[in-house]
Each structure stands twice: as structure tokens, then as C-alpha cells.
Amino acid sequence: LYCLIIDELSKVWSSPNCPKSILDRIKRCHHHYEPKCDHMTKFNTVHVHGQGTWEFRLWGNTKSPSEVKFCIDNSIDTFRSAYNRYYARDNSMFDRIAKLYPNEKLEYTFPSIARDAMVQGKSIETILADIENSRLASTTRESVG
């Protein structure tokens, strides 16, 4: 599992349970992203429960760790609609991911892309465009060759 660093998603779920100082600490530990984040904090990644709940937890470095948890309940559809409300784009982002990785579940591909975006300091949109462009370039090379 990845240590998934939330930036864009934290804007979607700007929860009162998640103080800004914690978000700052999450962002600061992006270079220790796998399998856990030990830079001031331990940030445990996405747990996809039986019903498709996405859960993010942050532990402080204490004997009785405080836990910050924000869940999007029930299903990937709930997660999808929250994300789309933020981007105001139907399901286009998820459709693009599904086209790029037709044989893989969104539960796995999306966190991986989000992690890459954080590590590289790019938006998810930019990461998707990079993947699409590189695939287009390799397809063009094959047809020419």
C-alpha cells in the first residue's frame, strides 16, 4: 500500500477534524510514501473496506496516538461524486483512468495516480495528461515504424 499524500482531496474533504497543521505535516512527508510515512507522523494509507469505504488515518508520534480519520462511506460512487463536485466534471477523470487501465480497479489505480501527483508536485490532471501523451507517442511510433 502507498502512503497516499492528500492535497487536492484534502480540499474536497476540508473536515473540521483535520486541522491545517496536520495537512501541512501530511504534505511535508511526501518523500516517504511507501509503505508508511515516518516524517514526524505515520500516515497509513487508503483502506478499501468491504463496502468500498475510503479511509485515511494520521497518527502522531505518541504512545497514545491521536487519530484523525475521515471516511467517505458506502461505495466508490460516493467517493466519485464528491470528487466530481469539486472538479464539476461528471465522471471524466475516472473515465480517463478507466480507459488508461481497463483491466485494473479504480480503487487501486486512482490512489496510485494521486500519489504520483503528490510525489512529483503535479496535479492529477497533469499526471493523466502525461500518461495519455506518452501512450499516444508510443502508438504513433509503432504505426510509423
Summary of predicted features, one role per range:
Residues L1-G145:
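C-terminal accessory/tail domains of diverse enzymes
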